[in-house]
Amino acid sequence: MQKKVLILKHVNCCSIILFFFASFAFAAQELKVGFIQGRGNDAQVEEQAFKNAKIEFEVLDKGNYKIDTLLKYDVIAVGVVAYDKNEPLKENFKVVNEYVEKGGYLVTVDFQQDSTWNKNFLPHPLELLDPDLDDNVGVILADHDIFKKPNALTDKHFGGGWGAGDFMADGPHEAPKPWKPLITDKQNKWPLVVWAKAGKGDVVFNSLQILQSLGRTGKKEVSEVLHNFLFWRGPRTVDAKGKLATTWSVLKMH
């Protein structure tokens, strides 16, 4: 009898865990993703990357750069060299930074061109140089939630299999305060991904070629990286005292 009880407890526990992670994944895509497209040549690759990751998004066009419109999104993702090729973004980057200051989350999900980079494009100054790295260089991950949810990421996610020339390009050589390095390569100690708070929001500058790699290889580990880079933070705001309208809100409260 005792053995049966233990088995039932084990089954119930497993069911709860499976339900939690299923709910967590569902809640993550409840988040509204705004996407700023990059260069035209990579548009299909970018679209394929989101398709491979089963992530829904809305493209931000030139008429969308109004603070009330941007604040409807939980996260705004920036595509391949968008700060070089996307004219509406270059003309309205200050509005995007205001979105961050007011509680939004901005993340570059592919590399940005160093030669046309303005160090003031983001809420905090950041200089870019022209280092390029192939995959499997070896990386060090910081202790940060971006590697913990919705997937548990390890250095193996950033190892081999990203594709020829599709790992990292045009990143900073240092992370001046308030930037903090999230991913550092072992050989050069370059901060490949950096993060900072800005007002009520967060900004992540990433020089890994996530969209290009995922769009071309469909690699599961890169898909999990994209999920985490977009969804680790959760919703832009959660009114804990008000009505819990989303699964994510319920999870946050428990």
Residue ranges and their predicted role:
Residues N52-T69:
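A short, well-structured beta->alpha microelement
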Residues V5, F26-K32, Q37, N41-D42, ...:
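Extracellular ligand-binding/catalytic regions of CAZymes and related secreted enzymes
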Residues L60-Y65, K90-K94, N188-L192:
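Alpha-helical scaffolding within the catalytic cores
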Residues V33-F35, V59, V75-G79, Y105-V109, ...:
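Structural recognition of the beta-strand scaffold that forms the well-ordered cores
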Residues M1-V11:
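N-terminal secretory signal peptides that target proteins for export/translocation
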Residues E46, A82-G160, P178, N206, ...:
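A glycine-rich, often tryptophan-bearing local segment used as a flexible ligand/cofactor-contacting loop or short
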Residues N12-S23:
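Bacterial N-terminal signal peptides
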Residues E174-L192:
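Short, Gly/Ser/Thr-enriched beta-strand-loop segments that form substrate-interacting elements
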